Design a protein with these regions (language model features):
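Donor-nucleotide binding loops and adjacent catalytic segments primarily
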Residues: 1-64, 97-100, 112-121
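A short, well-ordered alpha-helix in the C-terminal region of glycosyltransferases
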Residues: 134-148
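C-terminal alpha-helical cap of glycosyltransferases
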Residues: 148-165
Length: 165
């Protein structure tokens, strides 16, 4: 952000920073603005500790940068949103990396390791936003992974099990 995000001059960022990081984010943004960091970039960053209508946030997004918990991965598949996943290193059995890699292998998402995020994440996201062909391919590929009738499928399977008894 400090260098003005080359290539991202017209990208709007909606950032859910979380309640534990809100004060630090406020401090960072205030300091960056006071020191003139980021040029015009900071005016395109909108942040909050919590987004109450994630469906609307997904609807307006071209690319989503996110951790890769199972619920989030499912939501992004259903929303047909290209994603750059940053798996949390603080979860059991590194399951978020496994979740993300399932999509990366299908060219439906990108992965940036948490330890490399500060160095590589912004460039990866900006590159994806500015590559319409890759972005569209990822959106199509992630859409193919959506299980849009999962609840109905589970219910149908349960009924079949009941009928067998």
């Amino acid at each position: 952000i400090g260098d003005g995000c080359p290539g991202g001059e017209n990208i709007e960022i909606l950032w859910q920073c979380g309640k534990y990081y809100k004060a630090g984010t406020d401090e960072f943004m205030a300091k960056a603005k006071a020191e003139g960091l980021g040029g015009n970039t900071l005016k395109f960053i909108h942040y909050s500790d919590f987004i109450g209508r994630m469906d609307l946030a997904y609807a307006m997004a071209d690319v989503v940068i996110s951790r890769s918990g199972a619920s989030t991965v499912s939501e992004l598949c259903a929303a047909h949103k290209a994603a750059v996943f940053v798996p949390s290193p603080n979860v059991a059995e590194d399951h978020q990396t496994h979740n993300a890699m399932a999509l990366v292998r299908k060219d439906a998402a990108m992965l940036v390791k948490d330890a490399e995020a500060q160095e590589k994440l912004l460039a990866a996201a900006i590159s994806l936003v500015n590559d319409n062909e890759r972005l569209e391919a990822m959106q199509k590929n992630i859409a193919k992974l959506a299980l849009t009738n999962a609840a109905g499928d589970i219910a149908e399977y349960a009924y079949k099990l009941i009928e067998k008894q």
